[in-house]
């Protein structure tokens, strides 16, 4: 089952992988295949998984993304929300596909951004919300009740910040 025979407590005993390279990484792909996972969860990883990995788990690969998709697809959604003076942001769980944060959404939770809140403070809050949303998402996937909500074509990107942007 998705959450393990002992429920949520068993989730924390799962292996965590953070390979620097996933594309054409045959050893890593074989390692994942041997695990025969029901679900692969991706959080704050920053790399697009190739179809060879996305096709492995029986119930799909899911991602926890720190924005209300389709707004702020990409590597720096929290930073862009703060830089743009947004009043709200949130967390979205979604099924992964080969695109950058383009998969079907599962759950969302919106939060207000404090007037003087820093990206670090917001990151901390969204991390807690994201963990809770991940658990809710996994429970729905296990029950077979997780929705698949298509994303609108009206999206914005949140590219990694660089020196040019800061000028």
Regions from the language model: what does each represent?
Residues 5-167:
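One-carbon transfer enzymes
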